[in-house]
C-alpha cells in the first residue's frame, strides 16, 4: 500500500512526481482511493483552505466552427443538432455578467466557437468587458480560440483577467483528436497569452481513448506551461461527433485523475469542468477534495445540473464560496 499522505507532504516540500509515482496514482487500488484523496486534500488545503471558486460560461458564439475536433458538437465534422449563431451583442454579455454576480460567481467566462476571433468580435468583447468591470467587478476569462499577440494585448487592456486555451490531450495523442491545427498551435496561444500579461488557463479532456501515460504527460505539460488554472473535463460523448459512443470512464478513475493533477500541479487552481455530472455522478462531492473550482450552470452545448444542487453540495461539504468582486463595483440599472 502506498503512503499517499507521505507523498503529499513531499509534494508540499517541493517534490515533483516521477512518472512512476504519477502512474501509481492512476493505478491506485479502489480500496485506497479515500487515502489518495486525503493526500490530495492535504495539498489543496495548504494552498486554498476550504474555499471553492465558482465559474460560469456564456456561449457567446455557437457552432459554425471550421475545425475537426473529434469531441466537439460544434465542429465541421459534427452532425449533432446544436444552435448556431454569430457573436452575441454587448447587452447579452452584460446580462450574463449580471446573472453571474447575483449567483456569487467569481469568474465569468466568455466563450466563442471557431479557430480564432475576428477583430470585430474582439471589439464586442472589449466593449463588454470594460462595462462588466465597472458595473460588477467580476473576474473575466475569455476563450475565443487561437489568439494573435495584438488581440491578446487588447483583451488585457480592456480588463480581461484570464484567457483559456486548452491543450486538450497529450502531444502524441493530439493528431488522433484533430488535424486542423497542431498541439504546438495550442501551446503557442498559451505563450501569447502569458506574454500579454493575461493569466493563462489551460486544461484537458479525459476519456478520449488516451493512455494513462498520456494523462501523466498532460499534467506534466501543464506544469511546464505554468498554467494558473487547469480545467479538467471528462468526455461527454455526443451523438453525431466522431467520439460518439466512447465510454471509457468511471467515477473512481475520474477522482484519481483529479488527484493526479493536484499532486502534479499543487499550487494551481484545479477545476472540475465539463462532463462532471455524467462521469463523476454520485461521487461529485469527493472531487472537491482534490479540485478547488467548478463550473456552475450549463456548458457550451450540454446541460449542467441544477445550480441549486451545486450550492447545496458545497454547503453539505462545509466549503466556502470564494467571491470577492472589486469593492468599487456595483450593479447599476
UniProtKB/Swiss-Prot annotation:
Q: What's the Enzyme Commission number for this chain?
A: 2.8.1.6
Source organism superkingdom: Bacteria
Task: Kindly state a single biological-process term from the GO annotations of this entry.
Answer: biotin biosynthetic process
Q: Can you state which reaction this protein catalyses? A: (4R,5S)-dethiobiotin + (sulfur carrier)-SH + 2 reduced [2Fe-2S]-[ferredoxin] + 2 S-adenosyl-L-methionine = (sulfur carrier)-H + biotin + 2 5'-deoxyadenosine + 2 L-methionine + 2 oxidized [2Fe-2S]-[ferredoxin]
Cofactor-binding details, from the entry = Binds 1 [4Fe-4S] cluster. The cluster is coordinated with 3 cysteines and an exchangeable S-adenosyl-L-methionine.
Query: Under which main EC class is this enzyme filed?
Result: transferase
Residues holding [2Fe-2S] cluster:
109, 141, 201, 271
Q: Which family does it belong to?
A: Belongs to the radical SAM superfamily. Biotin synthase family.
Explain the purpose of this protein: Catalyzes the conversion of dethiobiotin (DTB) to biotin by the insertion of a sulfur atom into dethiobiotin via a radical-based mechanism.
The entry's protein name is Biotin synthase
Origin species, per record, is: Geobacillus kaustophilus (strain HTA426)
